[in-house]
Amino acid sequence: MAKYIGPKCKLARREKTDLFLKSGVRSIDTKCKLEQPPGQHGQRRGGRMSDYGLQLREKQKVRRMYGIMERQFRNYYKEAARRKAATGTALLQLLESRLDNVCYRMGFGSTRAEARQLVNHRGVLVNGRVVNIPSYQVQPGDTVSVKEKAKSQLRIQAALELAQQNGWASWVDVDATKMEGVFKQAPDRADLSQEINESLIVELYSK
């Protein structure tokens, strides 16, 4: 699957918000000029953005935040539309239940990309078994842990230390000493970023 390997700040500046693509050791404001569009001098566009433009921009923002390509993101939307919960909420819950994202929430990586790499390199266990599929859907009650051989990696230790300082999400229960945690439940909408307007994504895909 193709993936974006260019500057992370460029994506954040395009969306004018922190996409959490870079390590949280330093503030995003010291790394990226979020108020300045990408380009040598910050390309300026006049006029009001169309409704379609707003919907597309929101979809791109969320897709990039979770590091997912278009086809897979659309498949998540289709799955969310089949669920009983509100489609937008179900979409976010599916994204949050990805193994790479759960590892990120537990502090096993300082970014989702870092957590995904740990999963790809067979450094993560789910209920005691190695799972190397980043999109694996973690279920409520599942225990996610760092493989014994990977626990000595300095970047994992640094990420956990940062997570301890910032605090963990309410839907995971983490034992930093053991480098393991329990995915208690899919998060409620109120627990997630209010900067995401998932209704715009639903409007875009429902056309």
From Swiss-Prot:
The keyword rRNA-binding applies. One of its GO terms (cellular component) is small ribosomal subunit. Pfam families: Ribosomal_S4 (PF00163), S4 (PF01479). SUPFAM superfamilies: Alpha-L RNA-binding motif. Signal peptide: none annotated. GO terms for molecular function: rRNA binding; structural constituent of ribosome. CDD domains: S4. It comes from the Bacteria. Part of the 30S ribosomal subunit. Contacts protein S5. The interaction surface between S4 and S5 is involved in control of translational fidelity. This is Small ribosomal subunit protein uS4. It comes from Halorhodospira halophila (strain DSM 244 / SL1). The lineage of its organism: Bacteria, Pseudomonadati, Pseudomonadota, Gammaproteobacteria, Chromatiales. The gene is rpsD.
